[in-house]
A protein has these predicted regions:
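Class I S-adenosyl-L-methionine-dependent methyltransferase catalytic core
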Residues: 1-180
Length: 180
């Protein structure tokens, strides 16, 4: 697994050795960031939340492309260890905040985020549930862009959000949403 673009392009990322997380494939990540770039233009100075972060590949990709800061939410201990090692190896720790624990247990937002990336376990609906909860806790702003990666046939519906785009990549489905 590697960073696709930006300051850290080509740098390898560690992934946890257990089966508790599912790293986003490079092809899926490349498709997602192409979709995001066409809507956001630049990632410069964005505040990003990478939720169900695993090794942090999505948030690190955003930081590599110029995002100002990323909050990472992850509960698996091995994934958190890999994430922290990745941030340290890239010198990205000062622009990151790692929240250990369930994404569903995150409290009120430290701020609203420009971009929220949800990569929950497939088939659980946890991405939609977490978005609904974090929206009520102030994580989502009026102009936020949200990405939920899910299984190809999994429904992604969240009250108060409109679907901006859907793209299928292999067995994954990428859904972009905005506040309605």
């Amino acid at each position: 697994m590697r960073v696709i673009s930006g300051a850290w392009r080509g740098r390898k990322l560690l992934a946890p050795k257990n089966d508790a997380t599912r790293p986003t494939a490079d092809r899926t990540r490349e498709t997602l960031f192409s979709m995001l770039a066409s809507r956001l233009g630049s990632f410069e100075e964005l505040h990003v939340a990478d939720l169900f972060a695993g090794s942090g590949a999505l948030g690190i990709e955003a930081l590599s492309r110029g995002a100002a800061h990323c909050v990472f939410g992850e509960q698996d201990r091995e994934a958190i260890d890999a994430l922290k090692k990745n941030l340290a190896a890239l010198g990205a720790a000062p622009r990151a905040d790692v929240r250990a624990g369930s994404v569903l247990a995150l409290g009120p937002a430290p701020r609203t985020f420009d971009l929220l990336l949800f990569d929950a376990p497939y088939g659980t609906g946890a991405g939609s549930v977490a978005l609904d909860k974090l929206n009520r806790l102030g994580w989502v702003g009026a102009d936020s862009l949200i990405s939920i990666e899910s299984a190809e046939k999994e429904a992604v519906e969240v009250a108060g959000f409109a679907i901006d785009a859907i793209r299928k990549v292999g067995k994954a489905k990428l859904t972009l949403l905005r506040p309605a």
